[in-house]
Amino acid sequence: MPGTGATGASVSTTPAAPEAGGGTVPFFYGSNLYAQKFGTVDPFQLTGTSQEFTYNVIPGGFLRGVRLQFRSSGGVGGTATPDNPSNLFSSMKFENVDGSEIMKPMGGYAYLQGARFFRPWDGDPSRRYDWAAGPNPSGNIFLRPEIRHTAGVLANTDARSQYRVTYTLNTAAGTITGGTTAPTVSVTKYAEIWAQPDAADAHGNPIEPLPPGLNLATLRRHDVKTLNGAGADNVIQLSLTGNEIRGLILIVRDSNNARQDYLSDPIRWTIDNRNLGVLSPDEVFDHMFDFYENLSNGTSTRPTGVYVFPRFYQPGRLVGEAWLGTTNATYLTWESATTAAGLNLPGTVEIIADEVVPVGALPMELESI
């Protein structure tokens, strides 16, 4: 029978207290993601004049970025302009606590392509459930300094120093042509955040207080160049050098601001005396399809006039290459003649650069992602 003849020490039925000593818990396991709405929703009916709005980002944790969810109502008639709904924003920017710009003023279409091609793991915003072009445009654009897995996050724990987001709503004619009633636009803003972890977990193990990606700063800038007349040569120089580059996007437009595939064969891409490629436009597009899964599997399409040159590594798919190092003296160019069949010229080439600035030791798993 159980217990008969037992002579050993008595056994306690009280659970033992947990013991510390399991080592330091990495930030990733001690934190969590959350989002918090901030600022007011200020409905605004589009007019013949653009309107600027500025909001302080709510403090707390480590900021990944700001999502702008835009909705419209009341618009009647008309035709969406080619870059609708993203061109609802004629300008967007994200400012540091000291007023310097982390994400420089650019149009909504430029930020749409930046979200799509510099943060491809978030997917194509134009394929989301709420993306709609027309007299009542809707969708969302994520202004995201963070790359992924905390790389590039921003310390946002001091209520005395706040980040700011500013956007300018376009004119009615800039978004809709021929409409009888302009839409009223509402923009809801969310701060996307890594939470500040507790000092220790439930077992008393200390938790890393800071994310490893805090040692990396990111920057988004653009540069607009002239596209010469039909058949003329273009030497398109990037003036935004001095940091490591994660990726570059060229957006080519005619004089009517319509996007066009106007670069011709060959496109010579060079940095100082080093050749980065002598490519046809088709080869540039093939490289895009090689690198971006949503292009190769057909869930997204390449936008007309958009040429992408990624310079980062996707760990999950084992594709890509290292960040492209530059100095202030770096001479980086693309040389290509404007196609002979081009119309409505001269036009423009907008260069969008996604840059990184290491400010401390960076874990290898975050290098070149």
Sequence positions of predicted segments:
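Beta-strand-centric surfaces of beta-sandwich/beta-rich domains
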Residues: 1-369
